[in-house]
Amino acid sequence: MTSADATNATLVQALRSGATSVEVNGVRAIVARSFLQRAKGLLGRSGLEKGTGMLILKCNCIHTCFMRFPIDAVFLDPKGEVVKTVRGIRPWRLWVWGGWRARMVLELDSRNTAAQ
């Protein structure tokens, strides 16, 4: 088992246990699990602190309507493996699709990840 596999297994185990926050590739992420949490996502926020994000479960497509800042989206499969990354998604983008394999998305403030 590689270190990436171990990290992914830890993520999946934390999600199955009902964790409200998890670590994904060094990012501390709030987990949006319920319908209302997933629908709201990052709406109403002016940004995120560096090293933080939101992990939206049961999601393979996002929008940035009503967002106040650009985001980076990292789409993950059920095992926690990255299937697609989209950087610099501006507010008011109507449709960003992660692909058929995506089951969750990690949203990050792209103003904090520009140098990475």
What annotation goes with each model-predicted range?
Residues T2-Q116:
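Compact, glycine-rich, soluble single-domain proteins
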